[in-house]
């Protein structure tokens, strides 16, 4: 019986060490940039410019500008609070592809100050099937004030109506650090 408990204790200790060591992702933190436009289900055009990543010496960096020409909404970032890996892979040439969630706060002309997140996906080159989605919530989270999540097409070209490019960049010495941060606009994805 003592032998079983010894093996059990060793297994629990190994699991605790694994969990305490941080993210299970082997992907190094990187950065993402992008710009373009999407066509909302209403037919309105919305332009965006986005960037984000890990930053050596501080947790995250980035920016967001977004304008919906149908509603007149204008969003200007004021801080970046999180940068998260959604999924990662490489294309046939070894270049990184995948999606990232960038989170922050912004001021808007319609809702005042808000929390937000963007999911931006790089599907490879050319960027015709890249994707962009945005959600705005009251500060501290809550029911979305604005979102493109329910729209039928988030692509930036190809067979879709939008245009632009999302580019996931390889890690470099200035983007060292862990994925993570806080994302009140996406409450099940906080901490890090």
Question: What do the predicted segments below correspond to?
Answer:
Residues 1-11:
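Bacterial N-terminal signal peptides that target proteins for export
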Residues 9-20:
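Bacterial N-terminal signal peptides
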Residues 23-41, 175-192:
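Boundary/junction segments of secreted and surface-exposed precursor proteins
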Residues 34, 102-104, 134-136:
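Residue-level detector of buried hydrophobic side-chain packing
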Residues 113-131, 135:
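A short, surface-exposed beta-strand/turn
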Residues 139-192:
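Edge beta-strand at a domain terminus
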């Amino acid at each position: 019986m003592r032998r079983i408990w010894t093996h059990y204790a060793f297994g629990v200790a190994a699991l605790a060490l694994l969990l305490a060591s941080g993210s299970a992702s082997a992907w190094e933190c990187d950065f993402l940039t992008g710009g373009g436009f999407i066509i909302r289900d209403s037919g309105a055009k919305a332009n965006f410019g986005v960037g984000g990543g890990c930053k050596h010496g501080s947790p995250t960096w980035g920016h967001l500008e977004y304008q919906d020409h149908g509603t007149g909404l204008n969003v200007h970032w004021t801080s970046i609070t999180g940068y998260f890996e959604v999924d990662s892979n490489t294309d046939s040439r070894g270049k990184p592809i995948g999606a990232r969630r960038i989170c922050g706060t912004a001021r808007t002309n319609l809702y005042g100050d808000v929390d937000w997140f963007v999911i931006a996906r790089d599907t490879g080159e050319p960027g015709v099937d890249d994707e962009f989605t945005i959600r705005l919530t009251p500060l501290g989270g809550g029911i979305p004030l604005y979102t493109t999540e329910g729209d039928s097409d988030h692509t930036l070209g190809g067979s879709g109506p939008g245009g632009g490019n999302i580019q996931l960049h390889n890690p470099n010495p200035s983007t060292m650090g862990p994925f993570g941060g806080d994302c009140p606009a996406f409450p099940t994805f906080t901490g890090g």
